[in-house]
Amino acid sequence: MTDRKTNLPEEPIFEEAEDDGCPSIENSSHLSVPTVEENKDFSEYNGEEAEEVVVPEKPASAYATVSIMCLCMAFGGFMSGWDTGTISGFVNQTDFLRRFGNYSHSKNTYYLSNVRTGLIVSIFNVGSAIGCLFLSKLGDIYGRCMGLIIVIVVYMVGIVIQIASIDKWYQYFIGRIIAGIGAGSISVLAPMLISETAPKHIRGTLLACWQLMVTFAIFLGYCTNYGTKTYSNSVQWRVPLGLCFAWAIIMIGGMTFVPESPRFLVQVGKIEQAKASFAKSNKLSVDDPAVVAEIDLLVAGVEAEEAMGTASWKELFSRKTKVFQRLTMTVMINSLQQLTGDNYFFYYGTTIFKSVGMNDSFETSIVLGIVNFASCFFSLYSVDKLGRRRCLLLGAATMTACMVIYASVGVTRLYPNGKSEPSSKGAGNCTIVFTCFYIFCFSCTWGPVCYVIISETFPLRVRSKCMSVATAANLLWGFLIGFFTPFITSAINFYYGYVFMGCLAFSYFYVFFFVPETKGLTLEEVDEMWMDGVLPWKSESWVPASRRDGDYDNEKLQHDEKPFYKRMF
């Protein structure tokens, strides 16, 4: 490895949170507006004085090996997707209702109350949020791969408890919490490992494979529910739960072939292994100059971080490194992903389509699962072709239109003679069609892109902590939507769609003003862009310092005198 001196700034480049606990976010539409000195310090800190690392791009077919490895990591999304696809059917199956529900003497049938339904469906997300915040740090201690294997075992323990439940709903409830803890940790560690391993020009596509696996699992979950619904015993729900062991074992087996993150290996001083990992991912020889230069940059960055001491949770509120602004943006994006209303359909799809008069709502759920899964293949192309911002903006606009039609038809046309009378078949079919189109738009845009954004936004020093917080925000909103949806739909029915419509309209404006474009940049270049103070709506024109020519004017990207409405249209 070539000798390299790391020039550190005399003062730490991060700043602890102010005493009042809340840093100012004035002019927060800027990624930042740093001084010349701050930019200089940051460049030194990241080793940017070195020559540009040139990793030659190859055709997609040349990356078959790294693509398969990333698919093994992305298979972690199967855990969460399988739960989403199966739980929506469980709460409508006769044996499940008999064991864990209440008996209605007047109707001579078993049922789940709104409270119990909400808790059983949504508590998985609470466990996932706990796993994000507390177990995902195993990836910093034992490595991303070993950390993943440990949390998969935790997930399996939760599944055992659920299968062993006889007639106590709270035992099943506890099992879902523990399984959620494992799945939540996986949802941080797996995308992190993909982002740190994948070549930059196909990183977005490989990260989108996470959502592909989620949607594939949802579809298979729907199919499994349909296949077991004719049984009258616990086969209805225990067989789908038992299949979780197969998914866990497949992922553990896959992880034995996946190389460790080169960034983590550099962090623990295993330089030669880091070279081998980076070379394998980029189809280069270990001695290739691009490999040596990239690892040298990582070493310089890690040495700078070590000189500043151990990263603390307080550092998440740092303004000089712009971590607080990045964290705020990713928390908002992850929250808005849930507020698009996707899990309203995925958690309660079977129940929703019963209400619109479908003879077999399980069959309708399978149709939704097919649309959801097939749509994700478009995202593998669009996320790196169109970019992150355009995908989110296009998705927000189209989903808003779909939700307006869905809610309006449900409110005005579904029950022309009142709720006590049969629903309109034509209106019911219309709601299903626009639900399918909504899911298509979601799966092509917001579904995968949010995982891409949170995986490539943060510096290595605080990446694990920040991704944990951002993912936990997503899961907590998932819990709130899952828990309160039965109560809300009982009170306002299809007016609920207008709530999601408002959130989608807001998300369009938020993305435009606060989310930068990171397509085609290395993780270190993403850091540099944030420190350069580029306006998000001008970020597509930003060029890293190592590739700028004499005509490049970075200041033009930091200011915009146009009124906000002229910036958008």
From Swiss-Prot:
GO cellular component, one term: plasma membrane
PANTHER family: GALACTOSE TRANSPORTER-RELATED, PLASTIDIC GLUCOSE TRANSPORTER 4
Record keywords, A-Z: Glycoprotein, Membrane, Repeat, Sugar transport, Transmembrane, Transmembrane helix, Transport
Pfam families: Sugar_tr
InterPro entries in the record: MFS_dom (IPR020846), MFS_sugar_transport-like (IPR005828), MFS_Sugar_Transporters (IPR050360), MFS_trans_sf (IPR036259), Sugar/inositol_transpt (IPR003663), Sugar_transporter_CS (IPR005829)
Organism field: Saccharomyces cerevisiae (strain ATCC 204508 / S288c)
Note: Present with 623 molecules/cell in log phase SD medium.
Its biological purpose: Probable glucose transporter.
CDD domains referenced in this protein's UniProt entry, alphabetically: MFS_HXT
Transmembrane region(s): 62-82, 119-139, 146-166, 177-197, 204-224, 239-259, 343-359, 366-383, 391-411, 434-454, 472-492, 494-514
Topology in membrane: Multi-pass membrane protein
Name of the protein in question: Hexose transporter HXT8
Annotated region described as Disordered, given as residue ranges: 1-38
Classification of source organism: Eukaryota, Fungi, Dikarya, Ascomycota, Saccharomycotina
Subcellular location: Membrane
Family per record: Belongs to the major facilitator superfamily. Sugar transporter (TC 2.A.1.1) family.
Gene: HXT8
